[in-house]
């Protein structure tokens, strides 16, 4: 993991991108994925599955992550299942990936790490 890049991304805010803005080129996507190695390419976006100790832990985690997404005004597709929360990020206005996806992924991963500490692990 590129911790320096992850810290940089997590400290930034998602930008309001106008429709038709260009999506990221593959080399830039590969570089940014180094900051969030648990996230994988999936179609036009990136996705991650968080593993938890119970269904209710997943519900609590999703509430936390949803609040962060709302603050950033960048919202993932989400699926809450037994002991799992799966998120998919992509930027609709660019019809693909933007830096916003990696900014939010970095923030969500940091929140998950803190959540795990507060919940006593997954």
Question: Where on the chain are the PLM-derived regions?
Answer:
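Charge-rich alpha-helical segments
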Residues: 1-122
């Amino acid at each position: 993991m590129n911790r320096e890049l992850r810290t940089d991304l997590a400290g930034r805010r998602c930008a309001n991108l106008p429709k038709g803005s260009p999506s990221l080129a593959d080399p830039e996507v590969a570089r940014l994925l180094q900051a969030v190695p648990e996230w994988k390419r999936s179609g036009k976006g990136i996705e991650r599955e968080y593993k938890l100790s119970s269904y209710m832990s997943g519900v609590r985690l999703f509430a936390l992550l949803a609040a962060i997404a709302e603050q950033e005004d960048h919202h993932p597709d989400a699926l809450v299942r037994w002991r799992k929360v799966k998120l998919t990020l992509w930027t609709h206005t660019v019809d693909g990936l933007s830096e916003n996806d990696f900014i939010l992924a970095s923030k969500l991963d940091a929140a998950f790490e803190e959540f795990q500490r507060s919940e006593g692990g997954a």
